[in-house]
Amino acid sequence: MKRPWNRTNSNVYSLMTSCEKASYNMNICTYVSVVNIKPKIYLISIDKSTLTFKNLTNNPVSIVLQSLSIKNIKLVKLLGKKSGFTYNKQRALENRKLTSLWKGHNVLNDCCFLIELHKLKKIHEMHDHCIFTFEIKSFKNFNHNFLTFQCLIENKIIL
């Protein structure tokens, strides 16, 4: 039997963060939770060894939480298993025409929803991850074909 923390079936997300100038990076997030209703506040846990963490710490200008759909499953290895420090994810996504613009932000095509976020603060630093709070600025819904943690297990992408 799986460990309790691997028995969840939460949505799989990608967080788009801005880098220097006009560039951006995207990652894979599964530690994401809404924790307040008014105002709507999200908690997101970010691996401290990633470019996403660096971007959130140094340059939190443009942040979009993207709920991935089943159509995005092939992007999980690119966005989650490759480091933004050593691999240009922006170039790979744009060369394959997998992004579009939403409110001036580069986002993935075929997402279930997009949430434009404003970073409030870093609230808890742990050994390998750090928890950040974000307030919702705007959002857009698209479809209901959510990519879930269980889909990643069934397709042997994780565990």
Tell what function each PLM region has.
Residues 1-159:
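Basic, polyanion-binding surface patches
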